């Protein structure tokens, strides 16, 4: 999981919903979803429409920009059209108010969307949180192509690293194979554009 810097929230989420409802649009969307969930726990979320377009389509370009078209979690590249899904870091079923909050939205590949699913823990590391760095918590085993927890971490940090590996399932066989292929394909190509490599943290 490679660190990235989150860009500022698109103005569409921060603007007041209307003159009659002077609250940020993301908050109104979240409150409405929470109200419907309170009435019906099986109510399924659909992205709100803004000017006749689904909100997720309007946010996607900004989400992709901040990761250089890589998956926010595993750093897979390039994201295909089927991969362009938005993960709610805090699951919308448990945190409905944050369903459209900018800081809760991450563009991810289909694999990471499936593996993380609705799993969440407060210890879970975020790739854009202040102070996060891959090599502060993990190291890469170039023999097994596994991501492993760095030795000697303070207990709290070690727990966060372990929680992240478990929830994200970064050592799934498909992930290890993807990293192996990436390493073998790019290890001898130092001049290849860095942002066009998949799993960039291996080469840094």
Enumerate the language-model features and the residues they cover.
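Histidine-centered nuclease catalytic patch
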Residues: 73-107, 119-132, 136
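C-terminal, charged low-complexity interaction regions
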Residues: 156-204
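Generic amphipathic, hydrophobic interface segment in small proteins and small subunits
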Residues: 44-46, 128, 170-172
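Flexible coil/loop and intrinsically disordered segments
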Residues: 1-9, 110, 116-117
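Substrate-binding/catalytic groove segments of enzymes
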Residues: 116-118, 146-149, 169-176
